[in-house]
């Protein structure tokens, strides 16, 4: 990339002294509620983003005030598992140190806080540290939170898969001590000129974000093919023997720029469990060395594979890993949803999956979700498992404790709501008012939109059919809308692009059907299509497959060539 000018972020990383920048000085300044432009990029590596309340932006401008700056902090919780004691700490932070007084479960199996004033950042990070939690590398050009199927039934297999996810997360953490020095007040250690501070990442880290997931078939709740790097567990007689490795997935794109596109990962082959770290490091270092550092819109691993070619990339990964891929093993990729209600595991323990609409845990009249989870955490002896569908599993409940846990869940509105198949399979990103990238609503509007979808399905007698519906406020794709049977991507206030045709299992992308349309047009279009689907569908045919089969949209086979075509 020496012939091209590097992206600004590359210079920022190079000059940052391994992610220190002037964050400490900015934190100490009370003149403004923000950080400098450069530090706003660096703080992402520490786990948070600078935001402002866009609902108040114009009003404050008229008053000649700076925007109402706040921060969104995202924790690193590999596999989404935390203890009840940790959850109580997480809850206390939300209640005392954020203006949102809420916890947001994310589509990557962790939680985030919104509405943090700059003065509270350090206190929050130190409080998380006391709970053995952190936000290191939850954002930024590094390996993000590692997802893992929270399968509450195959407990032994889940334990083995989770151990791999946890090891991946720990092994691929940045080594810089910037986080410990700035936020935890640890002493800066003296280093020599030739000392390797970041043995995997190097001084400029990765060209762009890097997302990783471990799936346990037949479940695909982690949407493994949408990740930069995926590991699909292969078991024999209930024991983990290895993984099918996938690489090159990613959701983000830019409206109107056809050289950007979402993409599902390629299958590369089977690897043994003992070789996982070799291959993970090999894939990451190829991306580190080959990835585009001039154009951040084309810097994800998916573009590296497209630009260099599958075979060339595969050969380089094998060379760096020192191991060849074996032929991919046969596995069945199935449902992406969660199992709601009580499920008994093979170990005799029970697991209660609670639906949390759009992942927002907050006390509201008639639904005191935050208090309910707090009360459960006080007595629960198992663990809490966050899912990539923004839900919560109260896992490892003894049979004799079921009634007490269920009673608390019902008392606080965590159980008892009527949940349609489609609502249970649908997710939305945060969007307005806090996300600076949002062009339209998502989380705040989504429940009402799903009400309309439910009504249309009932009208046409297809309520029993789960349809994966996802909404985002922009095309960056945090809620993985391009892998939804019905995807809505914000284009402007109240206007969305409508995408159709993804597979129910997450093995095929969707394609744009209508551009820049409002709610009335979206619902009219879906009303017509649901009517056709009710009459014309084959036995067992999902909605996404139906829209492709009857020619409503063309199947996306090679995203680089036909997502936009």
UniProtKB/Swiss-Prot annotation:
GO MF term list: 4 iron, 4 sulfur cluster binding; heme binding; metal ion binding; NADP binding; sulfite reductase (ferredoxin) activity; sulfite reductase (NADPH) activity
Chain sites annotated for binding siroheme: 478
UniProt cofactor note: Binds 1 siroheme per subunit. Binds 1 [4Fe-4S] cluster per subunit.
Family: Belongs to the nitrite and sulfite reductase 4Fe-4S domain family.
GO cellular component terms, A-Z: sulfite reductase complex (NADPH)
Task performed by this protein: Component of the sulfite reductase complex that catalyzes the 6-electron reduction of sulfite to sulfide. This is one of several activities required for the biosynthesis of L-cysteine from sulfate.
Protein name (Swiss-Prot/TrEMBL): Sulfite reductase [NADPH] hemoprotein beta-component
Subunit structure: Alpha(8)-beta(8). The alpha component is a flavoprotein, the beta component is a hemoprotein.
Source organism of the structure: Shewanella sp. (strain W3-18-1)
Catalytic activity: hydrogen sulfide + 3 NADP(+) + 3 H2O = sulfite + 3 NADPH + 4 H(+)
Xref: NCBIfam families: CysI, PRK13504.1
E.C. no: 1.8.1.2
GO biological process: cysteine biosynthetic process; hydrogen sulfide biosynthetic process; sulfate assimilation
């Amino acid at each position: 990339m020496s012939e091209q000018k590097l992206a600004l972020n590359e210079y920022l990383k190079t000059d940052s002294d391994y992610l220190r920048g002037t964050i400490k000085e900015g934190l100490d300044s009370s003149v403004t509620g923000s950080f400098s432009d450069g530090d706003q990029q660096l703080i992402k590596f520490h786990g948070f983003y600078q935001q402002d309340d866009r609902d108040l932006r114009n009003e404050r401008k008229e008053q000649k005030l700076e925007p109402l700056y706040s921060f969104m902090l995202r924790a690193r919780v590999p596999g989404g598992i935390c203890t009840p004691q940790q959850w109580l700490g997480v809850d206390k932070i939300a209640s005392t140190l954020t203006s949102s007084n809420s916890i947001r479960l994310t589509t990557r199996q962790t939680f985030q806080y919104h509405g943090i004033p700059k003065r509270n950042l350090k206190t929050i990070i130190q409080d998380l540290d006391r709970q053995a939690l952190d936000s290191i590398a939850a954002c930024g050009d590094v390996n993000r939170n590692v997802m893992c199927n929270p399968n509450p039934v195959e407990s032994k297999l889940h334990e083995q898969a989770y151990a791999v996810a946890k090891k991946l997360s720990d092994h691929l953490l940045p080594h810089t001590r910037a986080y410990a020095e700035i936020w935890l007040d640890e002493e800066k250690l003296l280093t020599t000129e030739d000392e390797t501070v970041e043995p995997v990442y190097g001084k400029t880290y990765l060209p762009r974000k890097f997302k990783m997931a471990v799936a346990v078939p037949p479940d695909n709740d982690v949407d493994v093919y949408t990740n930069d790097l995926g590991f699909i567990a292969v078991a024999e007689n209930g024991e983990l023997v290895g993984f099918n490795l996938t690489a090159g997935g990613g959701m983000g794109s830019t409206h109107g720029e056809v050289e950007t596109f979402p993409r599902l990962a390629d299958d590369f082959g089977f690897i043994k469990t003992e070789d996982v770290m070799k291959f993970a490091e090999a894939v990451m270092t190829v991306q580190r060395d080959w990835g585009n550092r001039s154009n951040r819109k084309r810097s994800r691993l998916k573009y590296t594979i497209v630009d260099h070619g599958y075979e060339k990339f595969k050969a380089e990964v094998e060379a760096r890993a020192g191991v060849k891929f074996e032929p991919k093993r046969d596995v069945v990729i199935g449902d992406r949803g969660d199992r709601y209600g009580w499920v008994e595991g093979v170990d005799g323990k029970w697991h209660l999956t609670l639906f949390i609409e759009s992942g927002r845990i907050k006390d509201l009249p008639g639904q005191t979700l935050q208090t309910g989870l707090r009360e459960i955490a006080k007595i629960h002896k198992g663990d809490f498992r966050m899912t990539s569908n923004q839900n919560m599993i109260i896992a490892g409940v003894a049979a004799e404790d079921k009634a007490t846990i269920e009673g608390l869940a019902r008392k606080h509105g965590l159980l008892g709501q009527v949940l349609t198949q489609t609502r249970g399979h649908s997710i939305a990103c945060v969007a307005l008012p806090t996300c600076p990238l949002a062009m339209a609503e998502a989380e705040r509007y989504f429940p009402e939109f799903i009400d309309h979808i439910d009504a249309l399905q009932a009208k046409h007698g297809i309520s029993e059919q789960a349809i994966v519906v996802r909404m985002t406020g922009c095309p960056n794709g945090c809620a993985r809308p391009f892998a939804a049977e019905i995807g809505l991507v914000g284009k402007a206030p109240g206007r969305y692009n409508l995408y159709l045709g993804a597979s129910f299992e997450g093995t095929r992308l969707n394609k744009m059907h209508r551009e820049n349309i409002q709610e009335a047009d979206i619902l009219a279009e879906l009303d017509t299509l649901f009517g056709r689907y009710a009459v014309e569908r084959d036995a067992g045919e999902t909605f996404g497959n139906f829209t492709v089969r009857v020619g409503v949209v063309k199947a996306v086979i090679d995203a680089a060539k036909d997502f936009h075509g």
